Regions:
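Conserved alpha/beta catalytic core and glycan-binding cleft of carbohydrate-active enzymes
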Residues: 1-85, 120, 124-165, 175-178
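Short secondary-structure boundary/capping segments
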Residues: 10-11, 143, 190-191, 216, ...
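Soluble or luminal CAZymes and related metallo-dependent hydrolases
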Residues: 51-55, 103-111, 229
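C-terminal accessory region downstream of the catalytic core in glycan-modifying enzymes
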Residues: 90, 95-117, 165-186, 193-198
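Ser/Thr- and Asn-enriched, surface-exposed coil loops between beta-strands
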Residues: 134-137, 185-189, 231-233
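Intrinsic-disorder/low-complexity, polar/charged segments enriched in Ser/Thr/Lys/Arg/Asp/Glu/Gln
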Residues: 148-150, 198, 232-234
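C-terminal beta-strand-rich structural cap/linker in extracellular carbohydrate-active enzymes
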Residues: 185-213
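Surface-exposed, proline-anchored Ser/Thr-rich loop/turn motifs
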Residues: 215-236
Length: 236
């Protein structure tokens, strides 16, 4: 798929007012499409739950690093894969809290949360200074602010293939989601990625992404605010 129409610049807009999304209420869910129509090559089968989740994470790596506001739809962060016609197009849809018990779906949740936290924490993902190539099997986004550069790159094939990060410069780049680093000696040289492989590189060491889910959050201290304060002694 070609993602560039999700970039506000592609429409000639000067402000980041384009709300982009990968799922909505009036179309089949992307997880459903992958599960039903996904491609297969040898042992790489996108219709399997684990691989479907990998493809969703790959897509989210680009959705959430395109600067501008985003929308997510009900249980998208857990890979909701029921058809829009189940039971009918305008019927109420099943609320599937049980999805969170799935290790694979929980992984999608954690990566989605980490990507959102990353874009909210680091200014490079809010910049106006970025270029992109989003219309092929090798996709990339290059973002820059004065003190940080970021390059997002992924292989959308179901086979190994070359990707073209077009790093902003040579030198050491840090992989935010693995904690590893690479030394780039040729900024325009291709890299060979496995099917569905993706990376978010920065030229400043931001540390390694923290993948935290609801299990971890619920054991952390909570703050509760009461209103009105003072009260009449009864809290409902």
């Amino acid at each position: 798929s070609d993602f560039k129409w999700g970039v506000y610049k592609e429409r000639g807009w000067s402000n980041k007012h384009l709300i982009t999304y990968s799922e909505s209420h009036d179309e089949e869910r992307s997880a459903y499409k992958i599960k039903t129509y996904g491609n297969i090559s040898g042992g790489y089968n996108t219709t399997n739950l684990a691989t479907m989740v990998d493809r969703k994470i790959l897509t989210n790596a680009f959705l959430f690093t395109i600067p501008g506001p985003k929308m997510t739809y009900m249980f998208e962060e857990l890979g909701y894969d029921k058809s829009i016609n189940d039971p009918c197009r305008i019927c109420e849809k099943s609320i599937l809290w049980s999805y969170y018990a799935s290790t694979h779906r929980k992984r999608l949740y954690k990566y989605t949360a980490a990507l959102i936290n990353m874009r909210n924490t680091y200014g490079v993902f809010k910049t106006d200074n970025f270029i992109y190539a989003l219309n092929g099997d090798s996709k990339r986004i290059n973002l820059s602010v004065p003190d940080t550069n970021a390059t997002v790159v992924g292989n959308f094939r179901v086979t190994p293939g070359d990707v073209y990060p077009n790093f902003q410069h040579t030198g050491t780049w840090y992989d935010y989601f693995t904690g590893d680093s690479i030394v780039v000696t040729n900024a325009t040289a291709p890299l060979t990625y496995q099917p569905g492989e993706w990376h978010v590189y920065t030229d400043v060491n931001l540390g390694k992404a923290s993948l935290i889910g609801m299990d971890e959050i619920k054991h952390q201290p909570s703050r509760i605010a009461l209103f009105p304060n003072p009260s009449n002694g009864i809290v409902e």
